[in-house]
Swiss-Prot record:
One of its GO terms (cellular component) is cytoplasm. This is tRNA(Ile)-lysidine synthase. Its EC number is 6.3.4.19. The N-terminal region contains the highly conserved SGGXDS motif, predicted to be a P-loop motif involved in ATP binding. One of its GO terms (biological process) is tRNA modification. Keywords: ATP-binding, Cytoplasm, Ligase, Nucleotide-binding, tRNA processing.
Length: 323
């Protein structure tokens, strides 16, 4: 039997994803950068359902407007029913990469027409897992990207990057090559070009696939803990003068992993953002190793203030403090 073409592999992945996750949907959007991954996905998506291509111009590189307009024209030629260039302003909070990602997702959310297809591949998933491991980011980060996290859809998480590049060649598409992808100043670039090839060589191949399988297995475990934590939260919640508080005695009775997940959910509901494993464990110690210590500052979108989790009279409280 002839080997399935790259385009056919991508089409099969997109069709399978749609059957599992998007049964009631009849149109979708795709995030298009002009690079080979998103260009190949756009080509396949436009053949399946009415597709709107959304091209985000971050304005961070010389010629970005030309790159975006070229991608828009390609999307229309591939059969997209609409293609729009979305110009965004990238702030400085959390570093340029994080700020660009935040601006990009906000623009896609605002302008999307149905669910949004993102062209993350198995290789991207492997890099995400390695980043999480290296930074000690906790199980949720190591579990990688979710295939379906409405409205975000990642139908290519089981497909190697080499397949999207091959699909572009089969279709005669000229993809934009992002210079950041070869810039060694970026951690992901070095993971992609140095670390993963070395691991493949030392361990005899199959490392990217193994990392992706690890992410899937761990995500299943974290989903279960999330469910248990959601069921446990009402039993630990206490109505306070400044919103929901948590009873430390009720938290103490929970298994460690469940307790920390309850704390995480409580922090997020209270306005925390960008939580790290270190912060969550710091708040957890207010329950399990209470010695009268001060509170734990966590990230938030507050201006001129910071969000601090502390303990008072046997309950965890969230308070705002001036910076």
């Amino acid at each position: 039997m002839d080997r399935q073409s790259a385009v056919a592999q991508l089409r099969a992945a997109a069709e399978q994803f749609a059957r599992v996750h998007l049964d009631a949907c009849d149109r979708w959007s795709v995030g298009l950068s002009g690079g080979p991954d998103s260009l190949a996905l756009t080509a396949v998506a436009a053949r399946l359902w009415p597709t709107t291509a959304l091209i985000v111009d971050h304005g961070l590189q010389p010629g970005s407007a030309t790159v975006a307009e070229t991608a828009r024209i390609q999307a229309i030629s591939l059969g997209c029913v609409d293609a729009r260039v979305l110009c965004v302003q990238v702030g400085a909070a959390g570093g340029r990469e994080a700020a660009a990602r935040s601006a990009r997702y906000s623009a896609l959310e605002e302008h999307r027409d149905g669910p949004v297809l993102l062209a993350h591949t198995l290789d991207d998933q492997a890099e995400t897992v390695l980043l999480g491991l290296g930074r000690g980011s906790g199980a949720r980060s190591i579990a990688g990207m979710r295939p379906y996290d409405p409205p975000w859809c990642r139908p290519l998480l089981g497909v190697r990057r080499s397949v999207t590049h091959a699909a572009c060649r089969e279709l005669g598409l000229t993809a934009w090559q992002d210079p950041h992808n070869t810039d060694r100043r970026f951690t992901r670039t070095r993971l992609r070009t140095e670390v993963l090839p070395l691991l493949e060589d030392v361990l005899g191949g199959g490392v990217a696939e193994a990392l992706a399988r690890t992410a899937t297995a761990l995500r299943e475990d974290t989903d279960l803990i999330d469910t248990i934590a959601a069921q446990a939260l009402p039993g630990a919640a206490v109505a306070g003068s400044r919103g929901q508080e948590l009873s430390t005695s009720a938290l103490t009775a929970l298994p460690d992993a469940v307790r920390r997940r309850v704390i995480r959910g409580w922090l997020l509901a209270g306005g925390a953002t960008g939580l790290t494993d270190r912060q969550i464990r710091g708040v957890d110690r207010l329950v399990t190793a209470w010695r009268g210590q001060g509170g734990v500052a966590v990230g938030s979108t507050l201006r001129g203030q910071r969000l601090v989790a502390g303990r008072r009279d046997g309950v965890l409280v969230l308070r705002r403090e001036p910076v």
